[in-house]
C-alpha cells in the first residue's frame, strides 16, 4: 500500500509532512491542494517527519493537506520521439501546454503514444542479451536510434520472441525476454530511469582523447576540448557566454545536441526557441533542430524544477550515449542550479558553507560532471557525452565557490573577460587565464600527431607564451610611454596583437568566419607562427604600428574569404609580399 502523509508546515516551496509509512530519499509524492496535485521530491527524512521540495508554486497550500507517495524517484521517460522537442525540467512537453503561463499542477506525457515507428530487429530468437544491449533500431529524423534491453535489469536474458520488421507504436511489445527462472519480460520502446542516478551500462570509461571540432579557433587551436570532455565558461553578464555556447552547439561534430537552459532569463530562452528551429546544420544541410532537445527552466519557474532540469538533461544524454552516439550537452547556467541547491539548503537550516552554498557543493558538482565522458559499451562500440556548462559568477568574481569547485573537475576553462568584451574582441575568452588540460594528456598528443602533426602542441604553447609576453610589454608601454621602450619591444607586442586578431578573434555572425575547419586552422596557425619567427627591420615605433596594422587587415580579409578561393589566394599573395618588404 502507498505511504500517505499530511502537511505540517510550509516554507516557500519546502513542505514538511508527517507520514504513516516508509519513505525513501528522493522519492516523489503528490500533494493535493484545491483540486491540483503538486509534484514534490523528498529531500530529507527525520523519523516520521519528511521534508519535500515542491516543483510548483505552493500558494494556497494549507497545513493538513494530504500527500500520496508514488514509491519511485523522479524519473525521465526515454524513447523515440524526443528529438526536436521542448521540455521543462520535469520533462513535460511544453508544446502540448497552452496559454502564456504554465498552469500549476499540469503535467504532460513527454512522448507521442500514437506515432508509428519503423522497427528493424537487430537480434534473433535464442540470442543472449544483457542490460542496455541493442535489440532493434528505429529511425528518427534520419538518426538511427536503438531500442535497448531495459537498463534496470541485471544478469543475462534469452530472446524468446521478436517482432518482424514493421511499423509499431512505442507501447507495442517488440521483444519478449526470458530470465534464468523462465519468467517472461515484455519489452517495448519506452525506458524509465531516475535522474539522480548515473547510468553505468558500459564496459569501461577510458580517458577521452579525440578532438571535438567546434569551428571556434580560440577553442580548437588554443584550448581544445575532446569528445567526452568537460569544460566550463565563466564570465560576467554581456561577455558573450550564450553566443559562444550557441556557436559551439551549431558547429560541433556531435550526433545529438541537448541544451539545458536552467535559470536563464526568459527572453534568452525564447531566443533559443525561436532561433534554433531556423538554424541549418552545417554538417547535414538539414535543420539543426532535428537533432536537438531543449530543456528550459527560466528564472521565474520554481527553483526546485531548475535543479531537476540539469539532471534530466544529463540522463537523456546518457540514454543516447548508450546507443553509441556522440552527445553534446550544454548547460546554461550551472550557477543558477547551484543557487537552487543553496536555497533548499538554507530552508532546511543546514550548516552553510562559503557564500551560504551547501557544505557538499563540491561533491555535488564533481558527481555531476563525472557523469559525462567517453565510454566503451558492452558490445564494443563507443559513445560520449561532452559537457560544457556556463557559470555566471556574481559581479564577475571568478573566486566564488561555484567557479572554484567547477575548476577542480572540468578539464577545460574558458574565462570570458569583461575587458576583452568592452574592447569588442570576441569571443572574449582570455587566452592567458584559460586552459585545456587535454593538451597535457599523452593520448591526446598521440592523436593530434596522427590527425594534424607532431609539432602542433609545441606551436600552440608558443603562441600562448607570445601572448603573455605581449601583455607584459603592453603594461610597460602604458607606464613608460611609446618612446620609453625599445622598438624591438613594439615588434614583440604587435606580433602578439597579430595572434590575437587573426587566431583568437572570430565573427560569429559571418557565414565564412563563424566556422573554421581544422585544415584551415592549421594553415592560419602556421602562417602566423612563420610571421612571428620572421625578423623585421624598423626605425621607429610608428613604422611598426602602421606595418602591422596593414598585415592584420590582410589576415582578417583572408579569414572572411572562402578557403582556397581566388580572393583568398589573392590576399595570401599580398600578405607574402608585405612580409618580404620588411623582413631581414
Regions found by a protein language model. Give the residues of each.
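Short, surface-exposed secondary-structure boundary micro-motifs
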Residues: 20, 34, 72-73, 91, ...
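Short, compositionally biased
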Residues: 43-49, 80-91, 142-166, 184-199
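P-loop NTPase nucleotide-binding/switch module
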Residues: 97-140, 145-152, 169-229, 244-247, ...
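P-loop NTPase catalytic core
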Residues: 221-222, 228-552, 564
